Amino acid sequence: SFLDEGLLPAEIVNLTATITAFNAISDTRKESNKSIYTELEKIARVQSVKGSNAIEGIVTTDARIKQIVDGDSAPLNHDEREIAGYRDALDEIHSKHDQMSFSENMILHIHETMTSLAGYELSGKYKTEDNLIMEIDERGRRRVRFTPVSATETGEAMQQLVLAYMDARDNPKINKLLLIPCVILDFLCIHPFNDGNGRMSRLLTTLLLYRSGYVVGKYISLESKIAKNKNLYYKALEKCQHGWHDNKEDPSSFIKYLLKIILAAYRDFEDRINVVSNKMSALDIVRKAVESKIG
């Protein structure tokens, strides 16, 4: 596989090393910054629910999103039920990720949690009809951006996705962090659900990061960063989808994109901790750690 060939692009190696160094530092600081961590967690939760839904055009006012996320108000319409469902799925990942192994049953369970409040007919079930990934340009013209796996082949494709993940996860030559964007890319190319694939991909990203020991998504919203860079997200995705059906895709663009999002989250995390606690920046420590790892 791409990840096991041993000759990864230098940019990907650098990004991975820097993220790993930041992650190690964030772990050591939690005990002395508990109140800051708790506050960041509350903010990130609202931003994640807002950002991930906004990418799909599911919106309400900021005040309503906060009320729904905080559990202060029941959802009032379809969009708000979608938002509340995402909140429930994200909360479960934040609180129970150590019990949520990456499996078909777990993926279906997360989809059911995310969609059940909105009354999806196929909540927690794979698609029954073929779907297309469409794009609308600035003139309103529609084009097919990608043709996912057919409905009849989806069950088999998802089974293979999970098995491939388990094999790669247990391979000591493969960096667990690099595996995550590859899994998410495959998931988006399969597009296993009639609806909710984009939001599911972001929930699964958070789950897989947790299970690989990277907790930044709890304190800084990855979803809001993706929402702010939506065009870059779609460009990286489309570039990597070329040749996917023939196993000839090059996943490096999507790997770089997602690693940059994760690194930006860690940098934000570090900045916010420093602003409040006034401690020395970890950038020098990270640089030294990266240099020693690369050199």
Model regions and ranges:
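FIC/Doc superfamily catalytic core
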Residues: 1-295
